[in-house]
């Protein structure tokens, strides 16, 4: 909005934006609304095999999206989950050692893995919603084949989940008492 520091203007803008999304992409709107909590998002990630993570890069004013397969088990309820970017061929990673996979998970450059913070609002959409809204991404057959390979390789998935569960994420010391209020996350997260 033009009113950079006007909260009411921001709210009105968001309301109008959501109305437009609901009008143009009703199924995506429904997916947005039904995945606002961590639990509902994780349940959504369990139901489908292919999602797209969308980004707007402000510096270059470009958008980008990558297809991914969520790596979850039935007990996954962590704040971060690993996803595999389906632009990469998973067969190239199945035989890597635990240490090699760990290095890839810790690296963001040239890695097929990303870590999603599921306790935050994420710009993702499922392939099934895209199809219902008549939006067919390129290379869909390739993504389906790769997702199937990942889904069938439970040993690989378990290795990735184990690596992620053993990560130690940095925690920063709070210098002021006010900073400690939400230092362990929000109660509903």
What positions do the PLM features span?
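DEDD superfamily 3′-5′ metal-dependent exonuclease/proofreading module
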Residues: 1-189
């Amino acid at each position: 909005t033009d009113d950079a520091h006007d909260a009411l203007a921001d709210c009105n803008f968001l309301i109008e934006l959501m109305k437009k999304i609901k009008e143009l992409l009703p199924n995506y709107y429904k997916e947005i609304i039904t995945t606002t909590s961590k639990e509902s998002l994780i349940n959504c990630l369990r139901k489908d095999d292919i999602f797209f993570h969308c980004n707007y890069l402000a510096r270059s004013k470009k958008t980008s999206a990558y297809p991914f397969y969520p790596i979850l088990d039935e007990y996954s309820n962590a704040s971060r989950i690993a996803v595999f970017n389906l632009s990469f061929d998973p067969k190239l990673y199945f035989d890597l050692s635990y240490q090699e996979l760990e290095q890839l998970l810790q690296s963001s450059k040239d890695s097929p893995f990303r870590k999603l913070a599921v306790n935050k609002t994420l710009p993702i959409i499922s392939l099934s919603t895209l199809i219902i809204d008549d939006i067919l991404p390129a290379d869909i057959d390739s993504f389906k084949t790769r997702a199937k390979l990942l889904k069938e390789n439970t040993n690989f998935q378990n290795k990735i989940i184990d690596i992620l569960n053993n990560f130690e994420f940095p925690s920063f010391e709070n210098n002021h008492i006010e900073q400690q209020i939400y230092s362990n996350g929000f109660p509903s997260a």
